[in-house]
Each structure stands twice: as structure tokens, then as C-alpha cells.
Amino acid sequence: VYKRQVVGLGFGMNLQASLASGKEGMEFTVISVVGTMLIGWFIGRKFLKVDRDTSYLISSGTAICGGSAIAAVGPVLRAKDTEMSVALGTIFILNAIALFIFPVIGHALDMSQQEFGTWAAIAIHDTSSVVGAGAAYGEEALQIATTIKLTRALWIIPLALITSFVFKSKGQKISIPWFIFFFILAMVFNTYAVSYTHLRAH
């Protein structure tokens, strides 16, 4: 089920727009993704004493794109259903809160459209919540937030591959997350098939 969700995400993404957005938000994205993964893992394991898989799942969802990242990493980790449920529940609750509270904080701090869009894309996990918060703040904030968020979503690919190497048991063969390649194919199909259909229509 989780693998199909990740592939489905690809059908909603435009490859060209995602790569173009990478040039604009790359610095923020790299720092936020790597930093969040490290800090999340450290806090979860050392302070909250959360088990390894749940801590890694929550960190992945926080760093990249919420439930989609958890759905991508879970099968690679061979995470239990209970661990997946806890991670997804945690992320979705935080997203729901962020959707309503971020625009209020943005206005209270008198953030510009660009500042809020960048902040929302980096700090809010799930794509739908980023879009909702951006739209509530303004059209420009929505465009900036969506653009940077696309870049973060692409990190699903290296994250799943790295996870398969890092969490490989001794003597166990590396499990290649093949569904990630279907995610890429879905994104390519959505980009070029839609463009071709649009051109034929005109």
C-alpha cells in the first residue's frame, strides 16, 4: 500500500518544474533536510528514547514531505505497522496544526510573501499543508512554497536508496527499493505525456 502511494505521488509531480525549483531552493533544502534528519534522529533516540525505526521514520517525514517520505522509507526499513502508524500519526497531527497556525504567525511577524513561502516549505512537512498555508497567506507565498516543496519531495529518491544501504543487516543483501524507480517513471510520464497531450490539443 505504501509503495503504491509513493508511485502515485510521482503522477502528481512535474519533472521539469521540480528540477527548475532545485536551482532556487537548493541551499535551503539541503541544509533543512540534512539538519532535520540529524537533529530528529538525535532527539528521538537520545532524549525521547524512541525505537530506531520509529525515530528514523518521523525524522524522514519531518525532513522531506511527510507521509510520502514515511511511505517510501517504511518498506525499506521493514518497519512494523505500529511503527508506521505512530510516525504517520505524529506527522499528520503536526501538519494539521501548522496549516492553521503558520499564517497567523507569519502575519504576527510581518513576514513578506517570499519569507513566508520559504519558511512554510521548509518547516511544514506534508505537501498539501504547505499548499494550504501558502494559499492562506498569498499567491506569491503559495508559488514560492510549492516550488521549494517540489525540491524537497525529490529527496525521497536518495533517502530510500541510502536507507537500504545504512540499515542493511550483517550478511543481508541490499534491498533495492524498486518502487522508487516506478516513482521516477511516473513523474516522467506525468511530465511528458501531459505536455504531449496539451500540444496535440492545440
What residue spans do the PLM features occupy?
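Hydrophobic core segments of alpha-helical transmembrane domains in multi-pass membrane transport
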Residues: 6-11, 40, 158-164, 180-192
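Interfacial helix-loop-helix linkers and transmembrane-helix boundary segments
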Residues: 13-27, 46-55, 79-84, 169-176, ...
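Helix-coil boundary and interhelical linker segments in multi-pass alpha-helical membrane proteins
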Residues: 15-21, 107-114, 136-144
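Structural signature of hydrophobic alpha-helical transmembrane segments
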Residues: 23-34, 115-120, 146-154, 200
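Transmembrane alpha-helices that form the ion-translocation and gating core
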Residues: 28-59, 93-111
